[in-house]
Amino acid sequence: MKLLRVLRHATLALPLLLGLSSESSYAAPTDSLRLIPRPASVVRAEGSYTLPKTLVMRRNAPESLRRGLAQLTGRRVTVSSQGSRRLRTLIDPRIAGREGYRLEISSEGITLSGRDQTGLQQGVQTLLQLVEQYGDRLPQLTITDSARFAYRGVMLDVSRHFMRSDMILRLLDEMARYKLNRFHWHLVDGGGWRFPSTKYPLLTKKAAYRMTNDWDSFWQKDRKFVDEGTPGAYGGYYTRAEIRQVVEHATRLGITVIPEIEMPGHSNEIFAAYPELSCKGRWDFESSDMCIGKEQTFRFVEDILSEVMELFPSRYIHIGGDEAAMNHWGSCPDCRRRMEQEGLKDEHELQSYMIRRVEKYLNSKGRKLIGWDEILMGGLAPDATVMSWRGEEGGIAAAQAGHDVIMTPGSHVYLDFYQRESDGEPRANGGFTTLEKTYSYNPTPAVLKESEQKHILGAQANLWTEYVLDERHAEYMLFPRILALAELTWSPQSVRSYPDFLARVNHHLPRLQQRGINAYPLRRIAVDMQVDSLKRQITLSLSAERPDAEIHYTIDGTEPTSASPRYEGRPIICTDSVLLVAKLFHEGNPLDLPSIHYRADYHKGIGKKITYNEHSWNSKYPAGGERALLDGVRGTPTYLDGKWQGLTKPLDVTIDLGEVTELRHIFARFMQERIQWVYMPGEVEILLSEDGVNYRSVGKRTTQTSEEEYKPVFETFSFPMRERARYVRLRAANNRSAGHFIFTDEIVIW
């Protein structure tokens, strides 16, 4: 879920955060609908319908339709008891599907029918998108549509950095526009308490402010809060009136707001105000778990949840349940007594005891508990719903056990990750999740039986905010990736197509920017690499997120200009070494974005035998196993791409080239991703041998990367030489303590 929060503040890349709309003028065929999410069925007809100068609708028509048409068309919109045959809205229970609607535009006018009020509201958003695209002259068509999943959510963490309520209101407006219907509000965590408790006022007085907006400085050094009103204090909390405003606005839009109160872990901010709720009975840097042995803890939890339920009518209440350190429970007399009394064998069962007890309380108030997938550990509460973030395994297990699940895997829908290569991007929380990767996600695992698939309620995108300091940056990370989430949770899998979606989303970007949303402007170049061992070559295929952009490239490492070769779709073939540099241009002018650099080598080591002398790879990061470091495949900017091999021990391998070979250059690339405990090797050494017994060192290289570097770093350890050998041995030292990784993608031999 949170994925290792050891982080450092960096200055934002302002040109990118501005989201310049001047570069988003892609022209598609005039007959292509640009609707997001894509409807289940669209039947086009010849002709069009022109909106009358005065729009008349029935008095009970949705207010969102009246307001939206007036804003988009500038026309006068009036209401009457009878309405007009030219613009009719109806409730028709015969319409099939969850939140189903039917939109008919003919020469006679517009008829919008919904299965219920929710379906009618979804149809309103579709009609307004059509008006936004076509103006007052709408194409004749019939759209029949309904939702694939009931739960289509977005989570925003406001604990690590406080986000004002007006930003939340804007986000809700955009969510409704794209048929997203659940807003998960992560209100409290170790970064600060944002919920206004009347019974426990010290929570906002003593745990809502700190003296720095630098997350690493706060989290790694002292984790100290300051009192409200301290000069220079950073933070904030919501008033009860602000929460009511958000909930009421969301309700009008058809969105449910789900509050989250973290427990029993991620609770160190609570102890700044009420230290007696910890096992030690005092604030402590390493204390982040509530004491489950004390009855006082449960009184506190029930009191807070009662106040939460007063303000939030949501059926679901999220209680967190993730990443409890459990480092004090085993030695805490109160927790040990609880375990003995309840017959609990370990700390996992102790946490499960708390979750079950909290669930029973919520159920008694007519609510349901939802938690992160760690609540599976130690036994799942009877009626709990699981939010699966550590991959899909937890969600699969819960669904197979008959529990409802919301899929939110970090691999695809964590929006705190970089969305393009990190150069020139504002700092992100490690990882690499492009728009395409998010769009590719299918929330229904194939391993589930049909009877189990019904327990997958939907999916959710999460934005954790360690490095997201303000609302503009939050919008930059959310948009347009939540549009991909909207389509993957609403549209049938059979109608989804990423190239088609990409063309449509490029039309929505300038609209988002015109509405004041600071959306990421989609300017990435992707490189697809394929190794063909039969032809002894590597092919490189390029694609851009901007369909209207031109890609110019070179293969000698020089910077492309408009006179450089333009990529036209045919793969670039590499039979030895290529230093590819590619850049985006628009109408002959370079875009203000760093070029991408990519190296491909069909080298002498590809396919040769490799032996791991002491330690093999970590089972979580095998890449291609024993073939990974000699397969010609280079890793992407994320350690999660399956192309980087990870070890928690020193890397020591021997490569057999099959015969004594002329050697001119050997190099290996390593990654540092400090946030994820991945560090550069302190030293890399190359040794050579003709017989596999007697080795000679041809050089050692020490890393040039500081362990304090917070951004992803890629360093190549290079060994030029004029040698002959059959065996090549590479040793890379892991200087860090147990549990820290070294990651490498390829050993290149020339």
Model-derived features with residue positions:
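Short, compositionally stereotyped local motifs that mark structural "simplifiers"
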Residues: L4, A27, P492, R496, ...
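Active-site neighborhood of glycoside hydrolase catalytic domains
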Residues: I270, K280-G281, F285-P382, W389-A397
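Bacterial N-terminal signal peptides that target proteins for export
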Residues: K2-T11
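Acidic, contiguous N-terminal accessory segments
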Residues: Y26-R152, K365, L369-W372, L376, ...
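Aromatic, loop-rich ligand-recognition surfaces of beta-strand-rich domains
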Residues: G635-G699, K711-W750
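Flexible, acidic glycine-rich loops studded with aromatic residues
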Residues: L369-E374, G379-A384, R390-T539
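Feature activates predominantly on carbohydrate-active enzymes
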Residues: S32, I95-Y316, R357, Y361, ...
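Bacterial N-terminal signal peptides
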Residues: A10-G19
